[in-house]
Amino acid sequence: MAVPKKRTSKSRKRIRNNFWKKEKNDRIASRVFSLAQSILTGRSKSFYYAIRDKLPNSSE
């Protein structure tokens, strides 16, 4: 005779779900860090940004 399995608790479900989210976020963070490095070193060819010489309203 078949016996129903115990139901997975909400906390267990949340732990397992967060594990997958963490892995995805780590990958995204790695890409963002790589892009930031290429911008700071001047090697970025696909990202355009404006460079300001002086900040407006500076006290110096």
UniProtKB/Swiss-Prot annotation:
Q: Which terms in the Gene Ontology molecular function aspect does this entry carry? A: structural constituent of ribosome
Which Gene Ontology terms describe the biological processes this protein takes part in? translation
Q: Which UniProt keywords apply?
A: Chloroplast, Plastid, Ribonucleoprotein, Ribosomal protein
Q: Where in the cell is it found?
A: Plastid, Chloroplast
UniProt cross-references to SUPFAM superfamilies, sorted A to Z: Zn-binding ribosomal proteins (SSF57829)
Give the chief site where it resides: plastid
Q: Where does the record place a coiled coil? A: none
Q: Does the keyword Membrane apply?
A: no
UniProt xrefs under InterPro entries: Ribosomal_bL32 (IPR002677), Ribosomal_bL32_plant/cyanobact (IPR044958), Ribosomal_zn-bd (IPR011332)
Alphabetized Pfam families for the sequence: Ribosomal_L32p (PF01783)
User: A GO CC term?
Assistant: chloroplast
Instruction: Kindly indicate whether the keyword Cytoplasm belongs to this entry.
Output: no
Q: Which HAMAP family match?
A: Ribosomal_bL32
Q: Which family does it belong to?
A: Belongs to the bacterial ribosomal protein bL32 family.
Q: What name does the UniProt record give this protein?
A: Large ribosomal subunit protein bL32c
User: From which organism does this entry originate?
Assistant: Psilotum nudum
Source organism phylogeny: Eukaryota, Viridiplantae, Streptophyta, Embryophyta, Tracheophyta
Chain's gene name:
rpl32-A
